[in-house]
Amino acid sequence: MTLLILLRHGQSVWNQKNLFTGWVDIPLSQQGIQEALTAGEAIKNLPIDCIFTSTLVRSLMTALLAMTNHSSKKIPYIIHEERPDMSRIHSEKELEQMIPLFQSSALNERMYGELQGKNKQEVAEQFGEEQVRLWRRSYKIAPPQGESLFDTAQRTLPYFQKRIFPLIQQGKNIFISAHGNSLRSLIMDLEKLTEEEVLSLELPTGKPIVYEWTEQKFTKSALSFG
């Protein structure tokens, strides 16, 4: 059995302020830091061979904090794929104590366009709660100058299929720390959800969701905490 662990980053400073964040690179709040550490406690005894995050700092912070108390005692190290010489380790002994971490913008949050930096309640008052709900949760409706969930899936799913899924097929246990909508697009594919079903899919911050890869299919595990 091979595991795929999905984790939406801990609360960010802008989550705390109820602002649309998208691609704006905002760090975790104090609560988000604690959520990441708590998530780490939940998954500390699960095997992890490789980590993937987005290029946004809240995703990276969450992964690193979650791994601080992992039972393997292994240290995540960032692989700079554009400059592999930067992260080459020349000691086999040290390499055995490390877990590779890869970053990709394909896993970034959906880009919220003209909503980024705006207060969610104020936007709802301006455009109506139903319109904002469709922007945030529907599959193909995008906010002004932003991405829909469909647009987000056009980058997350090819990256998963090309870069991550082959590792799972090799028996590697994968930990992905990413964002609400990049993970929603992935879960929609893993669970074969319809466009209607994905409307109600909500992912809380800092709650691990675990899938088992067995018999050539993904099944949500009882180990999930979301």
Curated annotation (Swiss-Prot):
Q: Which UniProt keywords apply?
A: Gluconeogenesis, Glycolysis, Isomerase
Q: Name one GO biological process term.
A: glycolytic process
**What are the EC numbers?**
5.4.2.11
Residues at which substrate binds: 8-15, 21-22, 58, 109-112, 120, 136-137, 180-181
From the UniProt record, list the reaction(s) this protein catalyses.
(2R)-2-phosphoglycerate = (2R)-3-phosphoglycerate
- Tell me the InterPro entries matching this sequence: His_Pase_superF_clade-1, His_PPase_superfam, PG/BPGM_mutase_AS, Phosphogly_mut1
Protein name as catalogued: 2,3-bisphosphoglycerate-dependent phosphoglycerate mutase
**Species name for this entry?**
Chlamydia muridarum (strain MoPn / Nigg)
